[in-house]
Amino acid sequence: KASVGFKAGVKDYRLTYYTPEYQTKDTDILAAFRVTPQPGVPPEEAGAAVAAESSTGTWTTVWTDGLTSLDRYKGRCYDIEPVAGEESQFIAYVAYPLDLFEEGSVTNLFTSIVGNVFGFKALRALRLEDLRIPPAYSKTFQGPPHGIQVERDKLNKYGRPLLGCTIKPKLGLSAKNYGRAVYECLRGGLDFTKDDENVNSQPFMRWRDRFVFCAEAINKAQAETGEIKGHYLNATAGTCEEMMKRAIFARELGVPIVMHDYLTGGFTANTSLAHYCRDNGLLLHIHRAMHAVIDRQRNHGMHFRVLAKALRMSGGDHVHAGTVVGKLEGERDVTLGFVDLLRDDFIEKDRSRGIYFTQDWVSMPGVLPVASGGIHVWHMPALTEIFGDDSVLQFGGGTLGHPWGNAPGAVTNRVAVEACVQARNEGRDLAREGNEVIREACK
């Protein structure tokens, strides 16, 4: 009879992929998954299944397994802990060997870790809560084109949050009227104005016309105020080539900053653009359109802190990060957790802020968090307190909605932010007297 190589049939994942005795290595990429298994599937099996399907595993032994070293390449579920207050959920910790991932590719990282496993039958739901990126891997990325310090030096603006404004109505203005709104806001005292995320190149306003009129607005406002101004020109396009064409044209116009929608545009396009921006001295503003599709459900998808880490590696100088106080969702401690992950070099593990792993970015530049969405001048005390100086505060309707017009709206915001910063520096309690501070300043 023929010799038997191995037993065919379906194998339990936990025999190979659940290894509670494993000591994680400094070079491992660690993931924390929130797992909701189907009824009857034990936690160890579900955790091991996640580790297997997002690394080397398939549902049975294949003879080519003998041609490689499984121990060197397999993902391992090394710890499981129940989620407080949830009966059928637990956190599975998975360690991936560094060699599973292509250097400098967020695309490959995500394809491996979250590519296939989320459709897995044995799981009712799965959410990636956090990733620990080891320096051995993060060092293969360029990261943000410039980072917080270089941006401040380029703009010559220190010691306060930067102010922005999204031009509204976001769709329908002609390029010239759009440029006029940009000029009024910048002239009134804002640092930046912004293309809305869905302003690309539509029939009512083609991208090139918008770029030209906005550049004119920037130059005029700079000449009149003596400050450096910018407008986030949205370079997002249907193809990478078209996106690069727009970024190159922006550079030729001499503007300081361009913008990209990194989730709809994709990580590959974003990383290419970030490299171009560093090589050519452009700042890069990142909008997170589509993030809530991925991060809003509490038990399925990916937490935004993972998308934020991925963006810091892929590259961007600003990224939208919720407001804590405006019209869109976001809890304070958790938001501050990923705001620190964007800005700081070293972030301690702190479960109360949703940070599952200590993250050491070594020398990778930081990203400025952008607070945007339904905020207005009376939120200013809270925003200065929550976000501190290293942030961009964006008031769209909160600038353009001023009954006297765009420029007075911009003046209001600039006066308010400077008053709040000064009051804070003098040791006054913004939470209590913030509104009073603003009223005094506006007299």
UniProtKB/Swiss-Prot annotation:
The entry's active site is 168, 287
Q: What is its main location?
A: plastid
Q: Which compartments is it annotated to reside in?
A: Plastid, Chloroplast
Co-factor note (free text): Binds 1 Mg(2+) ion per subunit.
Enzyme Commission number, as recorded: 4.1.1.39
Site annotation Transition state stabilizer: residues: 327
InterPro entries per the record? RuBisCO, RuBisCo_large_chain_AS, RuBisCO_lsu_C, RuBisCO_lsu_C_sf, RuBisCO_lsu_fd_N, RuBisCO_lsu_N_sf, RuBisCO_lsuI
**Which positions bind Mg(2+)?**
194, 196-197
- Known catalysed reaction(s)? 2 (2R)-3-phosphoglycerate + 2 H(+) = D-ribulose 1,5-bisphosphate + CO2 + H2O; D-ribulose 1,5-bisphosphate + O2 = 2-phosphoglycolate + (2R)-3-phosphoglycerate + 2 H(+)
Name any Gene Ontology BP term: reductive pentose-phosphate cycle
- The positions annotated for binding substrate are 116, 166, 170, 288, 320, 372
Q: Which GO terms describe its molecular function?
A: magnesium ion binding; monooxygenase activity; ribulose-bisphosphate carboxylase activity
Key word Chloroplast present: yes
Q: Please tell me which top-level EC class this enzyme sits in.
A: lyase
Task: Cite the post-translational modification comment.
Answer: The disulfide bond which can form in the large chain dimeric partners within the hexadecamer appears to be associated with oxidative stress and protein turnover.
Give residue numbers for the modification (N6-carboxylysine).
194
The protein's superkingdom reads Eukaryota
- Choose one Gene Ontology CC annotation of this protein and give it: chloroplast
Q: How does it assemble?
A: Heterohexadecamer of 8 large chains and 8 small chains; disulfide-linked. The disulfide link is formed within the large subunit homodimers.
- Could you say which protein family the record assigns here? Belongs to the RuBisCO large chain family. Type I subfamily.
Xref: HAMAP family: RuBisCO_L_type1
Other comment: The basic functional RuBisCO is composed of a large chain homodimer in a 'head-to-tail' conformation. In form I RuBisCO this homodimer is arranged in a barrel-like tetramer with the small subunits forming a tetrameric 'cap' on each end of the 'barrel'.
Reported function: RuBisCO catalyzes two reactions: the carboxylation of D-ribulose 1,5-bisphosphate, the primary event in carbon dioxide fixation, as well as the oxidative fragmentation of the pentose substrate in the photorespiration process. Both reactions occur simultaneously and in competition at the same active site.
Protein known as:
Ribulose bisphosphate carboxylase large chain
What organism is recorded for this protein? Abies homolepis (Nikko fir)
> Coding gene?
rbcL
